[in-house]
């Protein structure tokens, strides 16, 4: 007799009628495990001293295979078991679906492990992890937590290997460690899924990552090829005008005196302010020099403290309004709309979080 679970399409549990009443059938894996345990006990009794060495070798080989299997399970994200890289976002119970889609479930299903290897999606995933660290960490299930820290580990290792955007990861780890410190101190007052000792170990891991990033040294590349210093001024200026982050401009300006001169250009910072903020916001935070000129560089960082900067990503998750499905655009999803492209909406990291607030 099958027992229907929350989803009526689920195979459910199998039950068998006995003289003592209905009993749930055990899965094959449980039976095999019990048989293996029974065989191990029987072997330890039956084996004599000569066969003991052979059995120990077999046992060692079995343990080695088991360790490799466990390592593969731990190293592999749970989300990789899902072939579809999309998820249906439902917020209420229906006849076909009982319950609703959670942030943790979406985090498990969407392919974030592969996304961090794509330079277009890297900043997007990091920003998403940062928002989860700030406000949604307690809403993650145990499996989602494991996926979260597995992805975070891969991000840190990627930064240590190729030195890509370490400042962004430092900000993420700082926010995550601050949140964890507050939650661990207030244990019992806040809902923190999992054992407190596990969270303390995770906090220690985060502190170790922070130290590794702090000790990160950029190796100077020795080659005879073309460098930034060899480019003409108008090309260097063009490169600076393509940056959307003020800190990137300052960092590049520290490379050579020429780049420093170009990075202090008032017109450059004016364009950056106009890109991120509205004119009404300028009027509220005007900063003038002694000569009466607007200090656009100082204004940029002042405005950044009061208003969110414009976010720009190479690739983002998309939401299909027709199907209510969240997906990566490259992977696609089974859309039934006549004109699918007209139904797609880019999803910012904050919008992703808001989709799962009930």
UniProtKB/Swiss-Prot annotation:
Cellular localization per UniProt: Nucleus
MF-aspect GO terms: actin binding
Region named Interaction with beta-actin: 1-83
One GO term of the biological process aspect: protein ubiquitination
Residues of the F-box domain: 226-274
Pathway: Protein modification; protein ubiquitination
Annotated Gene Ontology cellular component terms: cytoplasm; nucleus; SCF ubiquitin ligase complex
UniProt keyword list: Actin-binding, Nucleus, Ubl conjugation pathway
Primary location recorded for the protein, binned into one broad class: nucleus
Domain notes: The F-box is necessary for the interaction with SKP1.
Subunit description: Part of a SCF (SKP1-cullin-F-box) protein ligase complex consisting of FBXO25, SKP1, CUL1 and RBX1. Interacts directly with SKP1 and CUL1. Interacts (via C-terminus) with beta-actin (via N-terminus).
Function of the molecule: Substrate-recognition component of the SCF (SKP1-CUL1-F-box protein)-type E3 ubiquitin ligase complex. May play a role in accumulation of expanded polyglutamine (polyQ) protein huntingtin (HTT).
Name recorded for this polypeptide: F-box only protein 25
Biological source species: Macaca fascicularis
